[in-house]
UniProtKB/Swiss-Prot annotation:
GO terms for cellular component: nucleolus; preribosome, large subunit precursor. Belongs to the NSA1 family. Component of the pre-66S ribosomal particle. This is Ribosome biogenesis protein NSA1. Keywords: Nucleus, Ribosome biogenesis, rRNA processing.
Length: 435
């Protein structure tokens, strides 16, 4: 496997090459073939978001407010006696676009925040715009929606819109082609909103806003803090005419909300995921999904979700709230701040400074490597394993087996010839009967 790891350790990215079964916490297990730091920028420029845009390019969104276009080339390594052959990468920043964060706005937003310490502005989303080659979108916690273009090897800022912050997530609807780009966003004390952006990037318009759920049993207002959202396909038999969007959202208060815009502005169903209201911070879907993780279904069934709490748990639920299982179990020792479903795998990293890869179908851990610093983001570039040369013990074992196989084959041949020879002699000695 080949991974790029965004690490808080000196604000670098690290290239990891390792096979399934690698575990740096066990001396007897396989160890990484390659782990090397690149593009160090310091702790204040750690990579919050990473996006692969081609076979040898990615975008890095850094805490410094820069988005970098990074290219890499590879050359072989190894090949000595009993050493595996694999490729390692050299990285180069090809273009940089800066000044995309707004620290002053975050100071204003902190005045109405429940957080004890002020949060620095950061990137909360970075993805490619479907159907628009070399066009990208980045969202910030302060409420900046940036639209970027890659042209002639350079990054250009096409347009920036300001929305209400703080923004914990920004999700694009990509289940079908729409006349305008449709985004959902929300955050602390910031109800979920749907906005449309014209394809020419001239206008952003809010088209829908959620309402909070009813007060709790003590008639107290339920805190507003949506943390992540995924769209579904439009309802087949909508309750009313008009705007037809469906989505699910998790909140920092461990609720899973179900929305249909034709049903109203409040969630039509709400599920408590965790009994003690531990904060849930992320949302990934396991099932038939789009490149941006939206659900290719009109039904709120037939898929599962993965979320994290702020302690150490990665939990998989049915939409009903039934717990299917946990990833990592007691192996994870700190907040799993980053998770991402990619194909058949779940990639995880966080405060305990390990990066892990799990198999979705059984939640088995395939890889665990100490990254040296808190893991902020991960790209899984390749899932194939490097062919390892045989050890002397394995070579001797195979040689011994080959000798045994040859002896057995020779013995079987001798037995077969003996049987054939015996049959021939019996036919010759058998008296002929004249009619």
């Amino acid at each position: 496997m080949r991974l790029l790891i965004g690490s808080d350790d000196s604000g670098c990215i690290k290239e990891l090459v390792a096979n399934r079964g690698t575990n740096t916490s066990e001396q007897s297990a396989l160890q990484p073939l390659h782990l090397e730091a690149h593009l160090e920028r310091g702790l204040n420029a750690k990579a919050h978001q990473m996006l692969q845009i081609s076979d040898n390019e990615c975008l890095l969104a850094r805490m410094s407010g820069d988005i970098e276009l990074v290219s890499w080339s590879r050359e072989p390594r190894g090949g000595e006696e009993d050493k595996p052959v694999f490729e390692v990468s050299s990285f180069q920043v090809m273009a940089t676009l800066g000044g995309l964060l707004d620290g002053e706005k975050m100071q204003e937003l902190h005045k109405r925040s429940q957080r004890r310490a002020a949060s620095a502005d950061r990137f909360v989303a970075l993805f490619a715009l479907p159907g628009q080659p070399q066009r990208y979108f980045a969202a910030t916690m302060s409420g900046q929606f940036h639209f970027l273009a890659l042209a002639d090897g350079d990054l250009k800022l096409q347009k920036t819109f300001s929305v209400r912050g703080p923004v914990e997530f920004a999700q694009l609807y990509d289940l079908e082609e729409t006349e305008k780009l449709v985004f959902a966003y929300g955050g602390e004390d910031n109800l979920i909103k749907l906005v449309e952006v014209s394809r020419d990037l001239e206008q952003l318009e809010q088209i829908w806003e959620a309402k909070n759920v009813k007060n709790d049993r003590l008639d107290l207002k339920v805190p507003i803090w949506p943390a992540a959202l995924r769209f579904l396909q439009p309802a087949v038999s909508p309750a009313s005419e008009g705007l037809n969007y469906q989505f699910i959202a998790v909140t920092r208060h461990s609720h899973l909300h179900f929305y249909q815009t034709t049903h109203g502005r409040k969630p039509f169903r709400s599920v408590d995921l965790l009994p003690n209201r531990e904060p849930t911070t992320s949302l990934e879907v396991v099932g038939d999904v789009t490149p941006l993780g939206n659900v290719k279904s009109t039904s709120f069934e037939g898929f599962s979700i993965i979320t994290t709490d702020t302690k150490k748990s990665i939990l998989q639920f049915e939409p009903s709230g039934h717990l299917l299982g946990k990833f990592g179990g007691s192996d994870i020792k700190g907040f799993p701040s980053y998770i991402h479903v990619q194909g058949k795998y779940l990639v995880e990293g966080g405060l305990d400074r390990y990066v892990r890869v799990f198999e979705l179908k059984n939640r088995n851990m395939l890889l665990k490597v100490f990254a040296g610093g808190k893991v902020s983001s991960v790209l899984l570039l390749d899932v194939s394993d490097v062919e390892l040369p045989l050890s002397k013990k394995e070579k001797n074992k195979r040689r011994h087996k080959r000798v045994l196989d040859e002896d057995q084959e020779r013995e079987e041949d001798n037995e077969l010839w003996a049987q054939l020879d015996g049959s021939s002699k019996r036919r010759k000695s058998k008296p002929r009967l004249d009619g």
